[in-house]
Curated annotation (Swiss-Prot):
Organism, as annotated: Anaeromyxobacter sp. (strain Fw109-5)
GO CC aspect terms: cytoplasm
Catalysis performed (reactions): cytidine(1402) in 16S rRNA + S-adenosyl-L-methionine = N(4)-methylcytidine(1402) in 16S rRNA + S-adenosyl-L-homocysteine + H(+)
Gene designation per UniProt: rsmH
UniProt-listed Gene3D superfamilies: Putative methyltransferase TM0872, insert domain (1.10.150.170), Vaccinia Virus protein VP39 (3.40.50.150)
Record-level GO BP terms: rRNA base methylation
Protein name per UniProt: Ribosomal RNA small subunit methyltransferase H
Bilayer-spanning residue ranges: none
Alphabetical keyword list: Cytoplasm, Methyltransferase, rRNA processing, S-adenosyl-L-methionine, Transferase
Amino acid sequence: MSGEFVHASVLAREVVEVLRPAPGKLLLDGTLGGGGHSELLLERGARVIGLDKDPRALAAATARLARWGEAFRAVRADFRDAKNVLSALGLTGVDGTLVDLGVSSPQLDQADRGFSFSRPGPLDMRMGDEGERLEDLLRRIDERELARILREYGEEPFARPIARAVKRAVESDEALDTARLADIVAKAIPRKAWPRRIHPATRTFQALRIAVNDELGALAAWLDGLPATLNVGGRAAAISFHSLEDRMVKERFRALTQACTCPPDLPVCACGARASFAAITRKAVVASEAEVAENPRARSAKLRAVEKIR
């Protein structure tokens, strides 16, 4: 099982620098994946709780990190439920937490997961084994809602014609798999408008994956829970791979680090509020040229972090 889930952790050195793992610290890896980030934290003496809703990832990471014994604990859960997980474990907070967002390389490579358009696979796209599959989503929503998803989550300029073509195929009961869906999407986009560096279905597949897994909702819940999840002095780090995620992280972290809650048109602060968080990264940290050369997936990764100061 563990051999099926080999994943190169991005920005590994930077994550260690931000979270400062050390003996006595308890850290929460909200997106355990193959266990790469957690292993780095354990190697430096920290205790780690790893969350993942993908049973394959959980099994692989558990096998990989078994040598750490009681210092590591794996929990099958969505990182959006971090606060509830800690409560169930009898914990009031952690000294650091990390999420590495998006889909992992093993999930993309396993055709039966339905994430990739390079090989035929079922219309699934669930990161776990619960919830609505992509096929069910496409049958349930109408063309207008599908276009909205493609436009908002994929920033797809041809959302309307793509939605029309996809719904036509779904409603005709055509036998669809990921490869056929990608072909339908590509043909709905004028050939001269095809992106130069990515497959024409890339944005659509991203949008559908986000919708199936409610990824932005999960991220919002994790961000909203940080004040209750972190101990004073604890740090939160988020690695994002597209603008929607990064924008949400940036805006929420900025709000956490701002003290004054007065209306912007008030000339003098009257609330007397003090910020409970401080920025650790003034701007997004990106991968080095060397890391990108070794792991091209790291090219779009952005790391942001804050610390709870009171």
